[in-house]
Amino acid sequence: MPMRVILRRELISKTAVLIGTAAAPLLAKGALAQTQAHGGSNMSDARVSSLVDALHANHPAADRADKMGLYGWLVGRWTIDAIYHLNEGTIRRSRGEIHAGWVLEGRALQDVWIVPARDAQRADPPGPGDFYGTTLRVYDPKLDAWHILWSDPLNQVYRQQIGRAHGDDIVQDGTDETGAPVRWSFTEITPNSFRWLGERSADGGTTFRLLVEFLARRI
């Protein structure tokens, strides 16, 4: 990759630590752009290092560590099998990746979700179900719940949800751009795998239709 030529080896090592490599590809691309703009690596390396130091946290914040475990198991790298349930029973499959870790002094968790995976051939323009986005998960002690902020600039899709534990699962409730109820859930959670469900309701929340599921395995 071009950025390996431009970025120093120690910077690659440091960014790889950042949130289980979640931000490493984004930061590396930023460093490459800075290098091209300024004709050298020293300035861009320093700027990337500054962002890494300010954003990354090695562990959850001590003042709420007992609550951060709801999503703490997500920290690390994952591969996902994406299954899209289309109209009339049609199914589309793809492969993707997730990178997650602690940020903002450990008071939040950030993860990057990418479909298809970066080592796969990507369509231009993006195909149905392709995305490259990030989630910021912030625990709110007043609500005893999590603010979920999803941003996918590739498709201009943005979601705000509230996440809570429901038994052994995690359920995030919100709405889509039409106001229809949307439910995203983490289920079947183990130390090395989970199943994620994306559902939407067309009747105000009485019933939900499964649109997509991700079967994730830790790597």
Where are these regions (language model features)?
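Hydrophobic small-molecule pocket/channel-lining residues, especially in calycin-type beta-barrels
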Residues: 34-219
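N-terminal secretory signal peptides
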Residues: 1-10, 14-26, 32
